[in-house]
Amino acid sequence: DYPKMFGLKPEFEIMTTADLLDSLLREEKLRFSRPLNLHVTYHDPCHSGRHVSIYLPELEKEKVFEPPRNVLKALPGVKLTEMPRNRELSWCCGAGGGAKSAYPDWAIWTATERLKEAQETGAQAIVSTCPFCRRNLSDAVEASKTPLQVYDLTELVAQAL
């Protein structure tokens, strides 16, 4: 947005945390030492999935959706199982765009539906890269007493170091 809004082109590359971690893994600058022994599923956030694809259509889908999956697959002792609705077809968690503030009951219902999909994979945990998703999915776990853990990708990376 900066080049369009201000006529400025930054002298640095802007990337997501998942992109950075994926890049560090490919460059062999990041290594893990602790196995996590955890079965997970990944929730694609609207902000880093559909929205990025809409605003930056020149990006290939694999560059948007694969970095967090590559990181999860590299974590020792982590098994990743996809939910049926994933990548650009992912079900929204209900938190984005101010929905959680404006419609809190709907937001929890939506997140609970997503948790049902996660449970159907047999996963012990649902992982995302969006703080809004993490918060709303955690709130839905508490409200519905769903036996799932909710993590941000960086939390698992830190545990495996």
PLM feature spans:
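Iron-sulfur cluster-binding electron-transfer modules in prokaryotic oxidoreductases
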Residues: 1-161
